Regions:
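Solvent-exposed, acidic/flexible segments
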Residues: 26-30, 47, 56-64, 84-88, ...
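Extracytoplasmic/secreted proteins, especially bacterial periplasmic and envelope-associated proteins
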Residues: 21, 62-69, 90, 94, ...
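Pocket-lining segment of extracytoplasmic ligand-binding domains
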Residues: 78-164, 175
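Bilobed "Venus flytrap"/periplasmic-binding protein-like clamshell domains
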Residues: 32-97
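Short, glycine-/small- and polar/acidic-enriched structural segments
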Residues: 1-51, 58
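N-terminal hydrophobic or amphipathic helices and topogenic motifs
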Residues: 18-23, 27-31, 191-269
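Secondary-structure end/capping motifs
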Residues: 145-212
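Sec/Tat-exported extracytoplasmic proteins
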Residues: 3-6, 10, 40, 50-53, ...
Length: 269
C-alpha cells in the first residue's frame, strides 16, 4: 500500500503511460496544489522561469516529477535554468536568503513549508494564465481558482489560478482483496471531510486516476463492505468467509454422496 501523487503513472517527463499492470488504485483521497513561489517578481508563465535558480525537490519526489514535466512542455531546458534539489523548509530558507529565485512545491495548503512561504515578505505566488492549456496536456492536473483572501485576511492579495493534482491510495495487484477493502474502508472514514479545494464527500473517489481501479474499490465505494465484514471484526470475518468458501462446498458434496452411495449399494446388490 502507498499514497501516490498524481503524475507518477506517466513515463519520465512525458505523458506516455507507464506499465500499470502491477499497481491498482483504491481511491483518490486528497487534493494537493502545485505552488510556484518567486522572490521579488511576478510570473504568469513557466517560460519566465528561464535564467532563474529554481528549487524543485530531490530525485524521485512528487514536486520534481511535476516540475520537470511542466518545464519540458514550456521548452525550458537544463541549460536555460539552474535546478536545485532543495524543498520544504530548506527551500524556504534558501528563498529568504536569496539563494533561490523560485520554488515549486506540490503540497496541501496546510503544509508547514507552504504556510511559511506565504508569510515571507516579497514572495509572490505565480498566477499561471495558461493553466487550462497545461491541464489539457496533463490529465493528472486540474485548474482551480484560489480566491483573494482565502488563506488569510489578504492572502492571496488577488485571485490566483492554480494547478492541483490528486493524492491516491494505491496497492499492488497481488495484495489480498480483503486487505484492499479494509484499507479503503479506513480511507472512507478518514478522508470524507472537506478542504480548501474540495467539499465534504468529494473523497474518496475514482476520478482522474493514473492506475487501473481495483475491482474491490468500485464495489466498496458503491455498496460498502460485505455484511460479514461490517458486523464482525476483520479477523473473524475472514474466518467466516473461508468457512463459507471452503467448508460449505465440501459439506454439500458430502451430503450428495451420502444420498448417492446407498442407492449405488442397493443397485449393486
Amino acid at each position: 500500500l502507498a499514497f501516490m501523487q498524481g503524475g507518477f503513472g506517466y513515463l519520465g517527463t512525458s505523458t506516455e503511460r507507464r506499465d500499470r499492470s502491477r499497481i491498482e488504485t483504491l481511491a483518490n483521497v486528497d487534493v494537493e496544489a502545485v505552488w510556484i513561489f518567486t522572490r521579488n517578481r511576478e510570473i504568469d508563465s513557466l517560460a519566465q522561469l528561464q535564467g532563474l535558480r529554481f528549487g524543485i525537490g530531490p530525485e524521485g519526489s512528487g514536486s520534481r516529477n511535476v516540475a520537470l514535466k511542466l518545464l519540458e512542455q514550456a521548452r525550458v531546458t537544463g541549460k536555460d535554468i539552474t535546478l536545485s534539489r532543495l524543498t520544504g523548509s530548506a527551500a524556504v530558507q534558501a528563498l529568504r536568503q536569496n539563494q533561490l529565485d523560485a520554488v515549486l512545491m506540490v503540497a496541501p495548503p496546510e503544509s508547514f513549508a507552504v504556510q511559511n512561504m506565504l508569510g515571507l515578505p516579497g514572495i509572490q505566488l505565480a498566477n499561471l494564465r495558461k493553466s487550462a492549456a497545461i491541464t489539457e496536456r496533463n490529465p493528472f492536473l486540474e485548474s482551480r481558482l484560489l480566491p483573494q483572501g482565502t488563506l488569510d485576511t489578504n492572502l492571496p492579495p488577488r485571485d490566483i489560478t492554480m494547478l492541483t493534482t490528486s493524492a491516491s491510495l494505491v496497492a499492488r495487484e497481488a495484495l489480498h482483496p480483503a486487505l484492499k477493502r479494509l484499507a479503503l474502508a479506513v480511507a472512507m472514514e478518514v478522508h470524507t471531510g472537506g478542504g480548501l479545494f474540495f467539499r465534504a464527500g468529494d473523497f474518496p473517489s475514482l476520478r482522474r486516476i493514473d492506475f487501473p481501479t481495483a475491482p474491490q474499490a468500485r464495489d466498496t465505494l458503491i455498496h460498502g463492505l460485505p455484511l460479514v465484514e461490517r458486523v464482525l471484526p476483520f479477523w473473524w470475518a475472514q474466518v467466516v468467509e473461508r468457512i463459507v468458501l471452503l467448508v460449505l462446498p465440501v459439506t454439500l458434496v458430502a451430503l450428495w454422496l451420502m444420498r448417492l452411495i446407498p442407492r449405488y449399494m442397493r443397485w449393486m446388490v
